[in-house]
């Protein structure tokens, strides 16, 4: 499996611009790989939307479109989860995932994106998108029985993306939830 890093930012550019060309152009430039291999495609690489393989102009565009606050940027990329990148628009989140699942390659979904988890841009380094998985609306989001202070990163607790509002357990019970759509 080879990660297709150049495709990721172009999917975001294409959706924001409402223009297929960023995707079409990068797919045309994509080299062939051996028949026994596959491209791994993704909307974010682990904990950032990397912009290392775009032009300076494209990077500036992506920052203006998706990371206006400098706290959202890291290492030449954007440290946000999918739902906040899409302004929590269910239709845009579905569109991005539809692209992911329809393009050539093996789709890779970063934990939490299947339920629309948020982030905390004020945590240092990449920790803003490395918060505990929100399994339930219970203590520590069902992630751990440890004291909350002992968790690697604090839970997301805001009213929009917090673990009491966004979690696997609640979405599994809702037939039209994002996790059931996925």
What are these regions (language model features)?
Residues 1-182:
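Active-site and adjacent substrate-binding regions of carbohydrate-active enzymes
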């Amino acid at each position: 499996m080879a990660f297709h890093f150049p495709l990721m930012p172009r999917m975001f550019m294409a959706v924001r611009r409402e223009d297929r060309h960023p995707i079409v152009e990068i797919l045309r430039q994509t080299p062939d790989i051996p028949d026994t291999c596959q491209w791994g495609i993704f909307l974010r690489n682990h904990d950032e939307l990397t912009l290392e393989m775009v032009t300076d102009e494209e990077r500036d565009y992506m920052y203006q479109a998706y990371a206006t606050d400098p706290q959202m940027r890291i290492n030449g990329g954007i440290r946000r989860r999918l739902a906040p990148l899409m302004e929590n628009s269910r239709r845009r989140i579905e569109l991005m995932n539809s692209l992911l699942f329809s393009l050539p390659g093996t789709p890779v979904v970063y934990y939490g994106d299947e339920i629309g988890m948020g982030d905390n841009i004020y945590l240092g380094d990449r920790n803003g998108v490395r918060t505990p998985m929100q399994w339930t609306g219970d203590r520590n989001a069902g992630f751990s029985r440890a004291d909350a202070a002992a968790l690697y990163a604090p839970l997301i607790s805001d009213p929009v993306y917090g673990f009491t509002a966004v979690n696997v357990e609640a979405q599994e019970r809702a037939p039209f939830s994002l996790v059931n759509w996925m």
